[in-house]
């Protein structure tokens, strides 16, 4: 399994829909079944991700989220901001506005 963390709003769901990756999103109430050979894009940072992606600026990224997602995350106080800071400080993320198919292909090449 390849597991890639992307911050909310970076294009994870679009890539999953277009290329058939597993979309493991904490915003959705039901979780997908994950198989051994899947490529999983998630917005939950865990120790075992193969790569981490963050936007350059938390506030701008948060403001780009839909109003529903902003409301959802505001109910959890600083959860998303704390998550952003954790990934930034602990995991040496790739900083860019959006994740692309090319990024995923590069990760797959590195994993062999």
Residue map of PLM features:
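Glycine-rich phosphate-binding P-loop
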Residues: 1-19
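Ordered hydrophobic segments in well-structured contexts
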Residues: 3-9, 40-42, 52-53
